[in-house]
Amino acid sequence: MRGARLTGALLALAGLLQVALSLRIAAFNIRTFGETKMSNDTLSNYIVQILNRYDIALIQEVRDSHLTAVGKLLDRLNQDDPNTYHFVVSEPLGRNNYKERYLFVFRPDQVSLLDSYQYNDGCEPCGNDTFSREPAIVKFSSPFTQVKEFAIVPLHAAPSDALAEIDSLYDVYLDVQQKWDMEDIMLMGDFNAGCSYVTSSQWPSIRLRRNPAFWWLIPDTADTTVKSTHCAYDRIVVAGTLLQEAVVPDSAVPFDFQAAYGLNDQTAEAISDHYPVEVTLM
């Protein structure tokens, strides 16, 4: 009996160590994330609950010119410990008066932010820029995973330009490679990479897709939308041997928060029209 208890304790300890020695990373398009959403107790409670699942989370569609909502979000995430989460946020991005930010929240006891930069995609006033919201790239290090340093390239693609923007992520990848002399790069976000925005006949023209160096972890058959549509808009793509080897098999999935929390359609859709997509690194 004593031996059985010891075995059980060791198995439990091994499970805790596996959790501690891994990173869960997500990309979440929180539709129109701003002060209105963070002022709604019900919605903000669920958003915080979702984000607490992750060691690094990319939040897209941040509509918060003065970072008031971002401040409220960090206060909620850090309500028990002021150092639970840190953040890095881009400048407002967009070709017209409509602007969004990329926001990363991360656990500093799990990862360290090493560097960040805004990708230069051309002259916006001249009309020859590539992206509606050019990627704001970050570099992290972690002592707990097989890959010690990696970069994350975020993208919330404009639906009408999704094909061109996804293809141009290849150029961003090359830029990150050269700037930081690194191979282990994760590209993630709401690419609008499905249904009518990118059709099956168009995929072969996308460099990021046809190059075998890139692993697309969220398949075309996935559904990352909350509504009745079935579209794999949100994706995670990884490049680099160490990063690819660190991916826990079958861990890359959409997180269906509606099913997980037993929400009705109205509440789920008020949180967002997208599910987060997530992956675990070991």
Curated annotation (Swiss-Prot):
PANTHER family: DEOXYRIBONUCLEASE (PTHR11371), DEOXYRIBONUCLEASE-1 (PTHR11371:SF27). Keywords: Actin-binding, Apoptosis, Calcium, Cytoplasmic vesicle, Disulfide bond, Endonuclease, Glycoprotein, Hydrolase, Nuclease, Nucleus, Secreted, Signal. Belongs to the DNase I family. Serum endocuclease secreted into body fluids by a wide variety of exocrine and endocrine organs. Expressed by non-hematopoietic tissues and preferentially cleaves protein-free DNA. Among other functions, seems to be involved in cell death by apoptosis. Binds specifically to G-actin and blocks actin polymerization. Together with DNASE1L3, plays a key role in degrading neutrophil extracellular traps (NETs). NETs are mainly composed of DNA fibers and are released by neutrophils to bind pathogens during inflammation. This is Deoxyribonuclease-1. Glycans are attached at N40, N128. One of its GO terms (biological process) is regulation of acute inflammatory response. Residues 1-22 form the signal peptide. It catalyses: Endonucleolytic cleavage to 5'-phosphodinucleotide and 5'-phosphooligonucleotide end-products. The lineage of its organism: Eukaryota, Metazoa, Chordata, Craniata, Vertebrata. Coiled coil: none annotated. InterPro entries: Deoxyribonuclease-1_AS (IPR018057), DNase_I (IPR016202), DNASE_I_2 (IPR033125), Endo/exonu/phosph_ase_sf (IPR036691), Endo/exonuclease/phosphatase (IPR005135). Disulfide bonds join C123-C126, C195-C231. Gene3D superfamilies: Endonuclease/exonuclease/phosphatase. Divalent metal cations. Prefers Ca(2+) or Mg(2+). SMART domains: DNaseIc.
